[in-house]
C-alpha cells in the first residue's frame, strides 16, 4: 500500500520526524495543534509575498515560549533589511499566540530537490500562464541535475484551459514508495488559474537512509554470535562434552 499512503506519514518515526515537536496531554492538545496550523498558515501567507521559498516550518514548544524553525531557500527575504521583517513577524506571532515566540531561519541548500518548493514554483508558473508541460519538464531536469535520484510530478485539472479536466504526469529515475528506508519527499500544492484550480503533486527520491546503520547493527549481531561461539569452545562447549562422554575401549 505504499502507493496509496502519504509518503511522509508512512515513514514517521523511522526516517522522518514530526514538524510539531512537543508533548502534552488532555484537551490542550487539540488547541495547540490548531494553533500550530494557524502559525503555519500565517507564516506561509506572509512570506509567500516575499518569494522566500519556505520548504517547511518546524514548531517546538516549552512551557514559556514557542520556537519556530523556518527552512527557506531565501533566508534574506525572511530576515529583511536590518532584521525588520523577522522582528515584525515575531511581534505579530506573539500577539496571535499570547506567548514569547523565537524564530530561527535555516537556509535550504538545494531548493531544486525540495518537493514543496518544486510544487510552488510550478504553481507560480501556471498562474502566470506558462505551459504546464514546460514547467514540469524544466523542474524535473533541475532536480535530477541537483542530485535527485528520482522525481515524479503530476498535474490535474483544466490543463491548458480546456473544458474537460484531465491529469498528466512526468517521471524520471525511480520512486520506491514501498521501501521505508527510501527518503521520499512529497508535497501537494494548488495553483489558482483563470480556468480553475490545478492540483500539483510532487515526489522526490533523495536516496536511502539508515543503510549504514542497518549494516552496523547486523555486523554487531554477527560479532556477538561469533564471540559466543568462541567462548563456548574455550570453556568446553558441545564438542568437549561429546569427547568426555566417549569411553576408552577395553583392551584387556
UniProtKB/Swiss-Prot annotation:
HAMAP family listed in its UniProt record: Ribosomal_uS3_B (MF_01309_B)
Main function: Binds the lower part of the 30S subunit head. Binds mRNA in the 70S ribosome, positioning it for translation.
Protein name in UniProt: Small ribosomal subunit protein uS3
Ranges of residues in domain KH type-2: 39-109
Biased composition (Basic and acidic residues): 222-240
Organism: Chlorobium phaeobacteroides (strain BS1)
Organismal lineage: Bacteria, Pseudomonadati, Chlorobiota, Chlorobiia, Chlorobiales
Family annotation (Gene3D superfamilies): 3.30.300.20, Ribosomal protein S3, C-terminal domain
InterPro entries for this protein: KH_dom, KH_dom-like_a/b, KH_dom_type_2, KH_sf_prok-type, Ribosomal_S3_C_sf, Ribosomal_uS3_bac-typ, Ribosomal_uS3_C, Ribosomal_uS3_CS
Gene Ontology terms, MF aspect: mRNA binding; rRNA binding; structural constituent of ribosome
Family label: Belongs to the universal ribosomal protein uS3 family.
GO terms for biological process, alphabetical: translation
Family matches, as SMART domains: KH (SM00322)
Annotated region (Disordered), positions in chain: 222-252
Keywords, ordered alphabetically: Ribonucleoprotein, Ribosomal protein, RNA-binding, rRNA-binding
PROSITE patterns: KH_TYPE_2 (PS50823), RIBOSOMAL_S3 (PS00548)
Basic residues bias spans: 241-252
GO cellular component: cytosolic small ribosomal subunit
Pfam family, one: KH_2
Subunit field text: Part of the 30S ribosomal subunit. Forms a tight complex with proteins S10 and S14.
Amino acid at each position: 500500500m505504499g502507493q496509496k499512503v502519504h509518503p511522509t506519514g508512512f515513514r514517521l518515526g523511522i526516517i522522518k520526524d514530526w514538524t510539531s515537536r512537543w508533548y502534552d496531554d488532555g484537551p490542550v492538545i487539540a488547541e495547540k495543534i490548531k494553533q500550530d496550523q494557524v502559525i503555519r498558515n500565517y507564516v506561509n501567507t506572509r512570506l509567500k509575498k516575499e518569494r522566500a521559498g519556505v520548504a517547511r516550518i518546524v514548531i517546538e514548544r516549552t512551557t514559556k515560549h514557542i520556537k519556530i524553525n523556518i527552512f527557506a531557500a531565501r533566508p534574506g527575504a525572511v530576515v529583511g533589511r536590518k532584521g525588520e521583517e523577522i522582528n515584525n513577524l515575531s511581534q505579530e506571532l506573539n500577539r496571535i499566540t499570547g506567548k514569547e515566540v523565537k524564530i530561527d531561519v535555516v537556509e535550504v541548500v538545494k531548493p531544486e530537490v525540495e518537493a514543496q518548493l518544486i510544487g510552488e514554483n510550478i504553481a507560480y508558473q501556471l498562474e502566470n500562464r506558462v505551459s504546464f508541460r514546460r514547467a514540469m519538464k524544466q523542474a524535473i531536469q533541475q532536480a535530477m541535475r541537483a542530485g535527485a535520484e528520482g522525481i515524479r510530478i503530476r498535474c490535474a485539472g483544466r490543463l491548458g484551459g480546456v473544458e474537460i479536466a484531465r491529469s498528466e504526469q512526468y517521471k524520471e529515475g525511480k520512486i520506491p514508495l514501498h521501501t521505508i528506508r527510501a527518503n521520499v519527499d512529497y508535497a501537494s500544492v494548488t495553483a489558482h488559474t483563470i480556468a480553475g484550480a490545478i492540483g500539483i503533486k510532487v515526489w522526490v527520491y533523495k536516496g536511502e537512509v539508515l543503510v549504514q546503520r542497518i549494516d552496523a547493527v547486523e555486523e554487531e549481531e554477527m560479532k556477538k554470535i561469533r564471540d559466543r561461539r568462541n567462548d563456548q569452545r574455550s570453556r568446553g562447549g558441545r564438542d568437549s562434552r561429546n569427547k568426555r562422554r566417549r569411553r576408552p575401549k577395553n583392551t584387556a
